[in-house]
Amino acid sequence: MDRVGVLLLNLGGPEQLEDVRPFLFNLFSDPEIIRLPFPWLQKPLAWLISSLRSEKSQENYKQIGGGSPLRKITEAQAEALEQRLAEIGHTAQIYIGMRYWHPFTEEAIARIKRDRLKNLVILPLYPQFSISTSGSSFRVLEEMWNADPQLKAINYTLIPSWYDDPRYLAAMADLIAQELDKCEEPNRVHIFFSAHGVPQSYVDEAGDPYQAEIEACTRLIMQTLNRPNDYTLAYQSRVGPVEWLKPYTEDALKELGEQGVQDLLVVPISFVSEHIETLQEIDIEYREVAEEAGIENFYRVPALNTHPVFIDSLAQLVTKSLQEPPCTFNQVIHPKENMKMYPQERWQWGLTTAAEVWNGRLAMVGFIALLIELISGHGPLHFVGLL
């Protein structure tokens, strides 16, 4: 077989404090992160939010050393994966494509084109599929494929999600068991799975399978672990006033404290690498919430990073994908009518020309209100914590 390329997809993260604001701008410019009825509002709103949130976000990054370790960890994962694939008989070139910071997905694709690969496996480093993570990267890649004849000549296949892969589950169970066994009474420890949240509307209205895959993944990990511990699944990182998946991590921690839980082991189930949401949000913010709730012992399972069983899981996923019929963008992004990727299926306001005129006027009023709030520093978005 010809040399195989493997494109690892991930979020990306600012490597120094100066990167924080442009990183946030890229993040909030993504219509899969903030869905707006009018695409022309996307970048002005992203500029507004990134301008107002950058200082607070920089303070958070200062608490973990001044930048995200995500790129270095992903590079280590890529190196380990290339080595493991070589051990099982595959000559592979690994590429890294980050969605919101360097090396961007576009940079990875440029390298792939220069290397003139014929076969490519696209592997997101998100175990569970979501419109806002893997889906967002797939959407960008699909647009690039549709516009570039050179890319159309590449035989590619996607691995949409792999939350139920036995080797991945074994790696997660191994890390949990290691942390439990450090405790005086392992069976008394409450296992707390904290997943990155998404707006409830993504599941209810857009058909995102993320919640179902997270819940199934949690059950499978506990089955693989085969311990009698009680456990909870909650969702972190909520932003803004809209309802997100529940229970929220901070609320669940308070409730467990009220129930008398003394020993808690947090498992970051959405993340395979250490980054701001494990090192700062869980280790610092949620630790404080737990302590205030009366939970005496707060432990955390480390992210998978380059755990050998996890790397073997990725290698086997790549191998399996090469033996099966290819999985295409169309199969994953547009599998059924009730899963809606933006902007291919934009929200439509109004059925008549007159209605659309009023929609435009309302949008302009809303944008002016945003600018006024930016200048004054006061308003409903500040009140609810979005800005």
UniProtKB/Swiss-Prot annotation:
GO CC annotations on file: cytoplasm
CDD domains the UniProt entry points to: Ferrochelatase_C (cd00419), Ferrochelatase_N (cd03411)
Pfam families: Ferrochelatase (PF00762)
Chain segments annotated as coiled-coil in the UniProt record: none
Binding sites annotated in the UniProt record for Fe cation: 196, 277
The enzyme's E.C. designation: 4.98.1.1
Family of the protein in this entry: Belongs to the ferrochelatase family.
Protein's UniProt name: Ferrochelatase
Encoding gene, per UniProt annotation: hemH
